[in-house]
Amino acid sequence: DLHLCDRRQRQMCIRDRSYTVLPEMLGCKEFVNADEIAKGLSPFNPESVAIEAGRLMLQRMDDLLSEGEDFAFETTLATRSYVKFVERTQAKGYFVTLLYFWLPTPEQAIERVATRVSEGGHNIPSDVIRRRYANGIRNLTTLYTPICDYWTIYDNSAADGIHKVAWGVKDEIKEIVDPLSYQKIVDYERD
């Protein structure tokens, strides 16, 4: 999940609970999310318009970037596709902040999707969730934290809210707040 905000400190964030934390953490009001676009296009069958929603999301991001607006967007980091976009935003003077909302296991992500489906949201097959989970963690530390101006990893598994795991600036780790969780992330990407 990836996001951008504030003209003087353009930002880029990442994962689950984004709706509640983004405005508060970043002062960011514009949140571009393909899932929400799909719900707007086809509320009863958002899966049927997923490709169109993804295209509209990318177009909206390009529009906001060319207008110099602050914004955030969501991604699982499962692909390399946003690396060039991050570099483009930085070239335009954006300060990119990555917020990664981590779940300790792919099974927890599968449970979250099942809950979302029970509440009327769209489904994602378990094998796709597992693949995106592994790729997202690997890309987090190999591709995205090294290029983001500021990054924070949060544990998003607790019922009482998110908890900071670590934070840094580009490829420099400034503080590991939760060494056990951070080690799980590092070890997972090696497996």
Regions found by a protein language model. Give the residues of each.
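Single conserved hydrophobic/aromatic residue that forms the stacking wall/gate
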Residues: D1-R10, I14
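Conserved beta-strand scaffold positions in the cores of enzyme catalytic domains, especially
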Residues: F31, L98, W151-I153
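Flexible, glycine- and charge-enriched loops at secondary-structure boundaries
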Residues: H3, E47-I51, T75, S126-I129
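Glycine-rich phosphate-binding loop used to anchor ATP phosphates in small-molecule kinases
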Residues: E52-L103, G136
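Conserved substrate/cofactor phosphate-moiety recognition/catalytic segment
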Residues: Y19-E69
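A glycine- and Lys/Arg-enriched "phosphate-lid" helix/loop adjacent to the NTP-binding pocket
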Residues: Y94-L140
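NTP-dependent small-molecule kinase module
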Residues: T142-D191
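Conserved nucleotide-binding/hydrolysis micro-motifs of P-loop NTPases
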Residues: E24, E36-A38, A78-T79, W102-Q108, ...
